[in-house]
A protein has these predicted regions:
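N-terminal Lys/Arg-rich, disordered targeting/topogenic segments
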Residues: 1-24
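Extended, charge-rich low-complexity interaction segments
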Residues: 103-104, 195-211, 258-278
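Short, exposed beta-strand/loop patches in secreted or surface proteins that constitute
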Residues: 169-173, 191-194, 276-278
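Extended alpha-helical scaffold/tether regions of large eukaryotic proteins
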Residues: 183, 268-270, 278-287
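A conserved glycine-rich beta-strand in the N-terminal activation segment of trypsin-fold
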Residues: 184-185, 189-254
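Charged, amphipathic alpha-helical scaffolding segments
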Residues: 192-213, 281-292, 296-304, 315-316, ...
Length: 331
C-alpha cells in the first residue's frame, strides 16, 4: 500500500511541476518583452528628445587639406555627373584617359554598392585631399549621420556587420574616440573609421582620422575668416562645391612635380581660398566660382584677376601642343 501511495504521489507531482515551469517561462518572456519595450521607448525618446551635440563638418577637416569637396546629396549628384552627356563625350578624348579610368573605377564602386550607399541619401558629405607622403596623397571622408549618430546600438553593430562581410576588425582609442580598423583579407588594405559626434569619419590613412579627431576641439579651416567668406559665396550652388586652400597647394602639387614650382608659389602666396561649384547639363559642363586674394597679392596676379573680358581668338590658331594659354585684357 505504501508503495502504491508513493507512486500516486509522484504522478500527481508531475503535472504540478510542469505548470510551475510553464509559469516561470511565461514570466521570463513577459519580463524580457517589457524590458525590450522600455529600451525601445527610451531609445526613441533619447533619439528625438535629447539635445543633439552637433558640430560643423568643416571643423573636423585637418588644416593641411589642399582641396575640399562638398556635397549635400552625394549619390544623386554622382549619378547626374557620371550619366551626363557632356561627360560621356569628354571621356572619349585621349587627354582624359587617366581621369576617365579614375571616374569609371569610382562609378563601378557606386553601382556595385548601390544598396549600401543608398543609406547615405541626402546627407552632407565632405571629402578632403591631403599629402600623406613624398609622392602620395589620400582622402578623408566626413559624413553627417544626423540623429543616427546617437544610436549606440547601431554603432556597436557596425563591427559585427563588418566581420560578417569578411573584414578583420580591431579597435583602438585615440583622444577618447574609438577607431575601428577594417582590414581587407585580400588586399591587406586597412580602412579606418570613427564616430565623432554626429559624423562618421573615414580614411585609408590612420593619421588623417586621428587629425580629424584632434581638430574637433581645435578647428583651423572652419574658423578661418577667408574660408567662411568663400563658403558663403558658393553655398547651395551646383552639384558639388570645391574649395582650394592655396596655402597647401604647393606641397600637394610637389607630389606630381617632384619639387616646388615658382608659378604655383606665386599664386599660393597671393591667394587665400577659392570656392568653385560644378554644373552640368546635356549641352555643357561648367565650373564657376570665386577667389579671395590677399592684400599682399603679387602685382602680376592682381593684373590677371582684374583683366578685362574682351573676346580673343588667339586660341583658334594656337598649336595643339600648347601647354598654357591665358586671356588678358585691359581697359
Amino acid at each position: 500500500m505504501d508503495e502504491l501511495n508513493c507512486g500516486q504521489g509522484e504522478q500527481n507531482a508531475g503535472p504540478e511541476k510542469k505548470k510551475s515551469t510553464s509559469k516561470i517561462v511565461k514570466r521570463t518572456l513577459v519580463v524580457a518583452a517589457l524590458a525590450l519595450a522600455v529600451y525601445v521607448v527610451y531609445s526613441v525618446v533619447y533619439l528625438f528628445v535629447s539635445p543633439d551635440r552637433n558640430i560643423q563638418q568643416i571643423y573636423l577637416v585637418p588644416e593641411d587639406a589642399a582641396f575640399i569637396i562638398q556635397s549635400s546629396a552625394p549619390i544623386e549628384d554622382w549619378e547626374k555627373f557620371s550619366g551626363s552627356e557632356t561627360w560621356q563625350c569628354l571621356k572619349k578624348a585621349k587627354s582624359f584617359e587617366e581621369v576617365t579610368k579614375s571616374v569609371e573605377k569610382l562609378d563601378s564602386v557606386v553601382k556595385s554598392n548601390k544598396v549600401l550607399l543608398s543609406l547615405v541619401g541626402e546627407r552632407d558629405m565632405l571629402i578632403s585631399l591631403h599629402k600623406t607622403r613624398a609622392t602620395k596623397w589620400d582622402f578623408l571622408l566626413i559624413l553627417d549621420m544626423q540623429k543616427t549618430s546617437k544610436m549606440d546600438l547601431l554603432k556597436d553593430q557596425v563591427e559585427t556587420v563588418l566581420v560578417m562581410s569578411g573584414f578583420t576588425v580591431t579597435n583602438r582609442m585615440h583622444n577618447g574616440i574609438n577607431i575601428l580598423e577594417m582590414r581587407d583579407s585580400e588586399t591587406r588594405d586597412i580602412f579606418y573609421i570613427a564616430f565623432v559626434d554626429n559624423h562618421l569619419v573615414g580614411s585609408y590613412t590612420s593619421g588623417l582620422v586621428e587629425s580629424a579627431i584632434d581638430s574637433r576641439n581645435k578647428p583651423k579651416i572652419g574658423l578661418d575668416q577667408s574660408f567662411i567668406e568663400t563658403e558663403k559665396l558658393v553655398s547651395g550652388k551646383g552639384l558639388v562645391r570645391v574649395f582650394i586652400n592655396y596655402a597647401r597647394v604647393p606641397q600637394f602639387m610637389s607630389i606630381y612635380l617632384g619639387a616646388r614650382n615658382e608659378y604655383i608659389d606665386l599664386f599660393s602666396n597671393s591667394m587665400n581660398f577659392a570656392g568653385l561649384y560644378l554644373n552640368t547639363d546635356k549641352e555643357r559642363m561648367e565650373v564657376k566660382g570665386y577667389t579671395l586674394r590677399k592684400d599682399s597679392a603679387d602685382p602680376y596676379v592682381t593684373a590677371l584677376l582684374n583683366s578685362g573680358k574682351h573676346k580673343m581668338k588667339a586660341h583658334e590658331i594656337l598649336s595643339g601642343r600648347t601647354a598654357l594659354y591665358t586671356n588678358i585684357g585691359f581697359n
